[in-house]
Amino acid sequence: MYATDFEYDGQYLSDYGFIICHFDYSSGANVATAGSKITFEKVSRNKGKQHSLTNTRYDECVTATFDICKNPELYETEEMMIENDEYRDLMRWLNRREFLKFQALDEDDKLRDTCYFNVSFNVEKVKIAEKLYGLRLNLESDKPFGY
């Protein structure tokens, strides 16, 4: 999925002048869990030649990791560093002790219904030359699917 913005608890990332971006941590591909791992419980029959399904359960919820930074279309190069007050506002908004409504958005999605998730974030700083230029968001949901 390609996304540039998201809504979380009724507010948009773009309201803060930020976009979803990617910092080049390595040249390898990124692998993300779909959060839908199912455990199948089976009973062996016919001396192990056949198994019958007795139960299934989801073992993990949806998780994702992505970066955010200031929108370069709104800020000059020398203004791309995240200031303390901007960092504080983003942390208050994103780093909560509860799951809140979330949806990822691209430019076309703002006017149509999409899939929602109940999520919260753990946040890490992305520093370049000891200056804060971005945040890495580790999204965790309360379900293995959206609604």
Locate each region found by the language model.
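Extracellular/virion structural assembly segments
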Residues: 1-147
